[in-house]
Amino acid sequence: MAHARISMYMPPDIDPTKAAIAYGCRALSKLNEELQSRDLLTRQKALVALCDLMHDPEYVYEAINIGCLESLKTLLQDDDNLVRIKTTEVLYIMATHYVGRVGFLKHDIIQALSLLLSDHQTLCRENLHQAYKHLAQLPKGAQGIVQSGLIPSLVRKLQKEEDHIQEIILDTLALCLQEDATEALESQAVPCLKEKLLSQNSEIRSKAARALIAISIPLDGKNQVWKNKVIPILVTLLSDTDEEVKANAAGALMHATVTTEGKYAALDANAIEPLLELLSTNPKTKLCLNATKALTMLAEAPEGRKLLLSHVPIFRYLLAHKNEAIQRAAEVAIKVIEWKP
């Protein structure tokens, strides 16, 4: 005779850490109610469920419309570590979607997240920096971060955070500095970025050089890069083992050598030789373009032009490059090098 046996295991489709999701349009409304619950476990389960749903931009749109962002803002100040971690994770996932970034700006999420910049939970800080990074990919998002006065805080955190979070901050800074580098320049960002160029981590070196490209766009940025003796370090990085580090270092030199002081600082650091060496190795498009433009800047100085005259064939070879931008850059370089007063 058969006996009834009750399994000690739950069915495979039941997750005890996640709130049950209601059917259809009621799903997010119910979760939003649970986010506001006084019961800790209910809040935690609702956040875990929300993390899954926010990968779909349609759910993100609906969540914003029913007021989930306001509930999440409140939970950022929760005493429970897991609640804060999952709240920042939900916001980070929402920020990967355009509709989420727009919602952040409308609901002042930038300032709300900034309260956790010094949170003792590493995952909280990592998630909020990921959210800022994705938000900054939207020009208005980058402007929002700048206008919120967060750039000095990000520069300070860059000196204290763990390596993997430093990488995220550098990505955010590079995007924000393209919009406005004023606050960064006033916050000693150039000396900080100079220090990061010397990091043992190639990702940090690469991203620091990329941020220097952005901060060198305004004249004050170019002057600070020269005054802080960053140019010799950038020249050294042209021989780095990492391709992206070399490309970004060449890009930073391209901007920094627009000024006369920058040109001669690069010439004194013997920048021409490693730049020419990069062109002779059939580099990738970005590296080739940046190196060509940097050499063009150096050719504007009589000493640079004299050194480059015998290397014009390298640039003539680039005239047949498959990339039109490199063709144009090579054409300009030849004109500058062969120019006679």
From Swiss-Prot:
It comes from the Eukaryota. Gene3D superfamilies: Leucine-rich Repeat Variant. Pfam families: Arm. It is found in: Cytoplasm, Cytoskeleton, Flagellum axoneme. Keywords: Cell projection, Cilium, Cytoplasm, Cytoskeleton, Flagellum, Repeat. Its main location: cytoplasm. SUPFAM superfamilies: ARM repeat. ARM repeats lie at residues 16-55, 57-96, 99-138, 139-178, 180-217, 219-258, 260-300, 302-339. Functions as part of axonemal radial spoke complexes that play an important part in the motility of sperm and cilia. PANTHER family: RADIAL SPOKE HEAD 14 HOMOLOG, RTDR1. Belongs to the flagellar radial spoke RSP14 family. Component of the axonemal radial spoke complex 1 (RS1), at least composed of spoke head proteins RSPH1, RSPH3, RSPH9 and the cilia-specific component RSPH4A or sperm-specific component RSPH6A, spoke stalk proteins RSPH14, DNAJB13, DYDC1, ROPN1L and NME5, and the anchor protein IQUB. This is Radial spoke head 14 homolog. It comes from Mus musculus. The gene is Rsph14.
